[in-house]
């Protein structure tokens, strides 16, 4: 899945969250000055070049860095999914109001676990199943605990976690 990472004025401390950068160690984030990512042609050119019309977005500051590009991309005909539990606002209310605003504009709210499940789709897809299971075991909360229990009952070795998820 093509992924675009962005930062805001990196030289002033706008670095990407380390855990996220660890997942994409070879990718240099687009260092932008625009508050609305969608106004930065360095970002939109990458999106247009990909040919994709569905966007899955997450951001720190839901009410600004997520809502602004999501709403603008919707206006340009993109189908936008906003990963609500991988995003956050300055307050719970700010996050909730921003999600409502995006939904009113046509965005589809989704959780990271739902994205993961939709992309995996079938556990028979063995090329990705172990990686997905590792992520669920490490970050899946009750679902991860249930998977660990299932693996234990079946006397199955859990996939090795590579970290950085």
PLM region descriptions:
Residues 3-8:
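Short beta-strand segments at enzyme active-site cores
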Residues 10-165:
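Active-site-adjacent betaalpha module
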């Amino acid at each position: 899945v093509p992924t675009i990472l962005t930062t805001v004025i990196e030289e002033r401390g706008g670095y990407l969250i380390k855990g996220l950068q660890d997942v994409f160690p070879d990718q240099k984030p687009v260092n932008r000055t625009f508050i609305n990512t969608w106004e930065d042609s360095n970002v939109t050119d990458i999106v247009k070049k990909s040919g994709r019309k569905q966007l899955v977005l997450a951001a720190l500051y839901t009410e600004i860095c997520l809502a602004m590009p999501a709403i603008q991309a919707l206006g340009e005909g993109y189908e936008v999914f906003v990963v609500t539990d991988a995003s956050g606002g300055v307050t719970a209310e700010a996050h909730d109001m921003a999600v409502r605003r995006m939904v009113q504009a046509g965005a589809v709210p989704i959780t990271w676990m739902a994205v993961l499940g939709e992309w995996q789709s079938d556990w028979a897809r063995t090329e990705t199943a172990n990686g997905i299971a590792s992520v669920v075991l490490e970050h899946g909360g009750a679902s991860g605990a249930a998977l660990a229990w299932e693996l234990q009952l079946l006397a199955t070795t859990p996939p090795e976690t590579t970290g950085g998820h």
